[in-house]
Amino acid sequence: MISGFGAALTAFGQTERARRPPKTSSPPGGGLHGGKRPRQRWLWAPVLASLILGAPGARAATGEVALTFDDLPALTLFADQSYVNYLNATLLRGLRRHRLPAIGFVNENKLDEIDRTQQIAVLKAWLDAGMNLGNHTYSHETPDKLGAAGYIADIARGEPVTRRLLKQHGKSLDWFRHPYLETGVPAAVKREIDNWLTAHGYRIAPVTINADDWEFAEPYDDAISRHDEARRRRIKAQYLAYTERTVAWYQTASDTLFGRQIAFIMLLHATRLNADCIDDIAKILRRRNLKGVTLEEAMKDPAYRLRDPYVGHDGIDWMERWSKELHKDLPWDSWQEPPDEIVQEYDRADNDRR
């Protein structure tokens, strides 16, 4: 199942993590989740109120979540094709078993990191399983590094295989996810990228639940490679506990901003950790009264018609972006970072924080 593991430690999948900002127990302003915002007066306009509270006849969105998986074909510590094949097969079986629709966002540069034919077969397996695919750029770089023109070129370069596979399955390439959730600085760069995406038929996939699964995933890979079963089980338990707390926090944040539960969009990654945890993740969603829906269905929630006002270097989720638009604080007092033990293990496994 896992060939050449001991010698296979590489920077495979490094693109997802290298630009993540360092985490702190008290997020400073502009960090991953930003700091606590000064309390400001909330001025209600009738149209804004209808978006938040739901206009007459608006679609009820309580108890819904769309699962999105970044960095396909896989995010791993190891350039091992059997490992990638196994985790995707396990993940897809679990999603189908629990009737959870999902979309995977592809970095096409990964197709040549191991065996191109088998990597493409992984993407095809997602579509064969009834899932969807989207564009995550070719190289998982950012507008900050590439500039608007270079970033747009990287998006276009990330299309060909994904678009062809979708067409073969009677689908079109409609969805784009920004790497690191970095959407462009200054405003003119963000606007140029947004305009190009719109002109080329893309919709941006927001994030309204982010449980930092990437931080747990590589220590988990490392534990498997070292045949440390006790550590593997401990990391899995810590991840699931953290995920359940984090999902609950975002539900509270939704109540804070909107006075109701929106249809959530959850950011995950195509990892062995999520493959091994998919049954438990499904249980967490059921306990939190969340039913799986497609990304298209979740995006019908009126909240996603709100403007995204954020222009900044840090990638932040849409709850924080909307808190700026609505001039309303998020419940940062109850936010928890991943356990220090996990942060330290991540840095030992792959010390690539910027």
Predicted regions and their residues:
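Alpha-helical scaffold elements lining the catalytic groove of polysaccharide deacetylases
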Residues: 79-80, 141-167, 186-200, 208-258, ...
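Bacterial N-terminal signal peptides that target proteins for export
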Residues: 1, 35-45
